[in-house]
Amino acid sequence: AGWTPLHIAASAGRDEIVKALIAKGAHVNAVNQNGCTPLHYAASKNKQEIAIMLLENGADPDARDHFESTPLHRAAAKGNLKMVQILLQHNASVNIRDSEGNTPLHLACDEERVEEAKLLVSHGASIHIENKEELTPLKVAKGGLGAILKRMVEG
């Protein structure tokens, strides 16, 4: 399976085309050769209106690509704060792990995405989950981010 018209429109940020395709019955959870759904691309490229349309029409917020990454992994790594909020509002799993054992919080910490990391923790992201390298998000965090997150959790 390759890219569907919905994948292309979502990736390109074409709101009206996405809306029309959904209205015509396009499969919102279609996967391409990388295991990605249109929502993976909307999340990655910070296409907020498109993500909302997809989610409101049944897109799975926890869809996994071939690396077991979800749209939330992508948004957290890219530093798309509003997208992280949108996905969390639509019940994206906050402690879901990719093929390397990383949670979205690991990726946010690794990329120094302070606000995204704080938002994930405030929604229940664990600072204690170890990835395959036995690193927690706190060990991956750079600068003072680890201390900030630890204070949030431990008070």
What are the language-model segments listed below?
Residues 57, 90, 122-155:
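Ankyrin-repeat-protein effector appendages
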Residues 16-17, 49-50, 82-83, 115-116, ...:
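Conserved ankyrin/ankyrin-like repeat signature
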